[in-house]
């Protein structure tokens, strides 16, 4: 047994065992490597009760070896931790230097040309730089350039529909509805009822409907959508604490989404939009976030999911299932046996663009490359996530797979490993387009 010098050790004359007491911070001393404070006393035999014989030389040597082993392990742990820290620091510093250099290239060489004439931009250079991650200082501008503005959204247009949104917000937060919203966390039926009402109102606004109560329908739609937005905001990047009530971007998120549902009543609010708008707000000003959100949702590969187009969505889901079958046959076979298909995971990943499923820093890099590489990158990412967790998924039941998909945000995901997986997946846009045509 390891004993201590008289400054840290003590004996209990009433204790008949032959072990010395350890200091209260013994574990801390070992785990922090401060084992030099553990002093093996040559005269440790004196610490024994007088009624017991002194330690033998063999015991003394045994305890000496134990002490030296603790020292050796602690030293080895400290050295390993120091090397790991040094390695991580070097990687971090290299990334910082790389981003500084990249920012200069983006600001001086790429963005000016892109803004002047997009056809003359160096696409190869843009893609190479994007794989390293976009510098935060220019990310918002690059996203806007990639998304474009085919809808010709202006600040004036945003302010017009923001005015409509304020009316809907005021009606939504009136005492009767406010009471219902505040109880939504206690009653899951609130969420269901609101979404059912939303679908009903959308139906009443369809081109086939000849109701003369159009204005009332619009106000009801805006109010219902606003209620849904206020609910879902509470679960949007909750760990950041900036979008929830009282957070610095809470009102901005309401403004962007409120203006959007008034601008596009044919689409309204769809679950997942809070994450999209929040991601844009993290990287650009409010008006630009509205412009980007509007044009992003309007793009060919996203619009069917937000319009809940039952003729368009199945094509994308079938294309994803075919991709899994072609590139990861064993997983596809298992999924088919237990009844899992792309509809169980892809819709949520597309409507949130992975920002709900993946850590924020990883999702941000995914966004960079989706906007640069195009929609095909969505399916490369989706397949890479399935491959990343293939050891779990390939032996899971239906319920276990669904649980894994739902709890992805709680899973630890290595950014480097995930992107290595993505890079290993080769998908041809033209072949994928043919799958969509089937």
Curated annotation (Swiss-Prot):
It comes from the Eukaryota. It comes from Dictyostelium discoideum (Social amoeba). GO terms for biological process: contractile vacuole organization; hypotonic response; pore formation during contractile vacuole discharge; regulation of endocytosis by exocyst localization. GO terms for molecular function: GTPase activator activity; small GTPase binding. Residues 54-104 form a coiled coil. GO terms for cellular component: contractile vacuolar membrane; contractile vacuole. InterPro entries: Rab-GAP-TBC_dom, Rab-GAP_TBC_sf, Rab_GAP_TBC_domain. Keywords: Coiled coil, Cytoplasm, GTPase activation, Membrane, Vacuole. May act as a GTPase-activating protein for Rab family protein(s). Required for osmotic regulation by the contractile vacuole in hypo-osmotic environments. Essential for periodic fusion of the contractile vacuole with the plasma membrane and consequent expulsion of water from the cell body. Transmembrane segments: none annotated. This is Drainin. SUPFAM superfamilies: Ypt/Rab-GAP domain of gyp1p. It is found in: Contractile vacuole membrane; Cytoplasm. Residues 133-374 form the Rab-GAP TBC domain. Its main location: membrane.
């Amino acid at each position: 047994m390891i004993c201590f010098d008289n400054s840290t050790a003590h004996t209990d004359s009433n204790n008949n065992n032959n072990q010395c007491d350890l200091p209260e911070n013994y574990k801390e001393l070992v785990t922090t490597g401060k084992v030099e404070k553990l002093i093996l006393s040559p005269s440790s035999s004196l610490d024994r009760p007088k009624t017991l014989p002194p330690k033998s030389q063999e015991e003394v040597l045994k305890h000496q070896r134990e002490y030296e082993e603790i020292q050796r392990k602690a030293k080895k742990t400290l050295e390993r931790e120091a090397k790991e820290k040094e390695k991580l620091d070097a990687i971090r510093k290299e990334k910082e230097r790389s981003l500084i250099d990249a920012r200069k290239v983006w600001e001086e060489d790429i963005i000016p040309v892109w803004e002047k004439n997009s056809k003359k931009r160096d696409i190869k250079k843009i893609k190479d730089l994007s794989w390293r991650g976009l510098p935060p200082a220019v990310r918002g501008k690059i996203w806007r350039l990639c998304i474009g503005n085919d809808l010709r959204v202006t600040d004036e247009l945003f302010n017009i529909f923001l005015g409509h949104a304020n009316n809907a917000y005021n009606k939504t937060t009136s005492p009767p509805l406010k009471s219902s919203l505040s109880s939504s966390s206690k009653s899951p039926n609130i969420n269901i009822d609101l979404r059912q009402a939303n679908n009903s109102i959308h139906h009443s606004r369809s081109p086939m409907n000849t109701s003369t109560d159009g204005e009332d329908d619009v106000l009801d739609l805006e109010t219902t959508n606003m209620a849904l937005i206020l609910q879902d905001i509470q679960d949007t990047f909750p760990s950041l604490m900036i979008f929830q009530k009282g957070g610095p971007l809470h009102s901005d998120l309401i403004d962007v989404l409120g203006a959007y549902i008034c601008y596009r009543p044919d689409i309204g609010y769809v679950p997942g939009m809070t994450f999209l708008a929040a991601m844009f707000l993290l990287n650009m000003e409010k008006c630009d976030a509205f412009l980007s959100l509007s044009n992003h949702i309007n793009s060919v590969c996203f619009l069917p999911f937000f319009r809940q187009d039952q003729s368009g969505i199945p094509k994308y889901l079938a294309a994803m299932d075919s991709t899994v079958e072609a590139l990861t046959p064993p997983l596809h076979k298992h999924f088919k046996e237990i009844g899992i298909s792309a509809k169980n995971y892809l819709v949520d990943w597309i409507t949130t663009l992975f920002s709900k499923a993946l850590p924020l820093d990883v999702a941000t890099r995914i966004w960079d490359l989706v906007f640069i590489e195009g929609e095909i990158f969505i399916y490369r990412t989706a397949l890479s996530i399935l491959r990343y967790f293939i050891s779990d998924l390939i032996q899971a039941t239906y319920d276990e797979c669904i649980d894994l998909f739902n709890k992805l945000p709680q899973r630890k995901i290595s950014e480097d490993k995930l992107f290595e997986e993505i890079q290993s997946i080769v998908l041809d846009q033209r072949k994928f387009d043919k799958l969509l045509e089937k």
